[in-house]
């Protein structure tokens, strides 16, 4: 089925196709180009709980990720300043590769990432929390103030005491006024029954009113001294004589009839 004139080239044959020659030269140039590039090693970050505090007295600069012709090699750009701490501490990984990013130090001029070192690129203040950034410290402050107010409640400078609203013009609170009113209530009721009510002035207990005069009482006592019971005609005569009604002519010994 195969013709004898067709033969496959041997593996040891020096003849190669032009396509294979071009492909091999391109791959060789690519390998040569790769060998000229220096790949930066990937950073291995340590967990925050293994970091150590470092004192800082100058501005901390962020790394410059791009090199521009007008910038010097290794110097951070002026816009890269993050904050300016004074006498504070920063947390950063411990190790010989850590370098503080101060423009005045010569170690900060070693390379692009010299401001943050080869181990880390993030610094945090020595605040209340070692895991969260320093911006979350204000929430811890607010929480601490709330706990203090719960333990020792007080009145803020701009706040008005609610008890002052309930005070009367005399300076007594509503509770004190309610206590005094409850004590004085029975006495006022007794005075009201006895005197029939009085104005805004303080009431004094008065004696019961007597509807008879002294002369009328003497005449009635004289009449009832000899006769305990009198008839209707004699009652009418005494009423006209003493200028009383028939119902008012009673025995003076019965005090309830004289005092109403």
From Swiss-Prot:
The gene is hoxd11b. GO terms for molecular function: DNA-binding transcription factor activity, RNA polymerase II-specific; RNA polymerase II cis-regulatory region sequence-specific DNA binding. InterPro entries: HD, Homeodomain-like_sf. Keywords: Developmental protein, DNA-binding, Homeobox, Nucleus, Transcription, Transcription regulation. It is found in: Nucleus. PANTHER family: HOMEOBOX PROTEIN HOX-A11-RELATED, HOMEOBOX PROTEIN HOX-D11. Residues 205-260 bind DNA. This is Homeobox protein Hox-D11b. Residues 1-21, 151-206 are annotated as: Disordered. It comes from Takifugu rubripes (Japanese pufferfish). CDD domains: homeodomain. Signal peptide: none annotated. It comes from the Eukaryota. The lineage of its organism: Eukaryota, Metazoa, Chordata, Craniata, Vertebrata.
């Amino acid at each position: 089925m195969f013709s004898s004139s067709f033969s496959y080239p041997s593996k040891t044959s020096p003849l190669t196709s032009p396509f294979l020659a071009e492909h091999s030269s391109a791959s060789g140039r690519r390998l040569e180009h790769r060998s000229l590039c220096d790949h930066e090693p990937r950073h291995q970050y340590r967990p925050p709980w293994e970091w150590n505090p470092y004192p800082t007295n100058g501005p901390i600069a962020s790394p410059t990720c791009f090199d521009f012709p007008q910038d010097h090699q290794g110097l951070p750009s002026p816009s890269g300043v993050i904050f300016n701490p004074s006498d504070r501490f920063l947390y950063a990984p411990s190790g010989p590769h850590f370098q503080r990013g101060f423009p005045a130090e010569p170690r900060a001029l070693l390379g692009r990432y010299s401001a943050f070192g080869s181990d880390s690129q993030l610094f945090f203040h020595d605040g209340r929390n070692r895991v969260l950034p320093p911006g979350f410290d204000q929430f811890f402050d607010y929480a601490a103030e709330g706990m203090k107010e719960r333990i020792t409640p007080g009145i803020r400078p701009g706040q008005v005491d609610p008890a002052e609203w309930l005070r009367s013009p005399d300076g007594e609170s509503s509770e004190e006024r309610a206590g005094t009113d409850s004590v004085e209530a029975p006495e006022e009721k007794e005075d009201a029954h006895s005197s029939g009510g009085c104005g805004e002035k303080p009431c004094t207990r008065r004696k019961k009113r007597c509807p008879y005069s002294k002369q009328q009482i003497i005449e009635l006592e004289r009449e009832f001294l000899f006769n305990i019971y009198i008839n209707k005609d004699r009652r009418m005569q005494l009423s006209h004589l003493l200028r009383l009604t028939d119902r008012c002519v009673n025995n003076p010994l019965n005090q309830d009839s004289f005092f109403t």
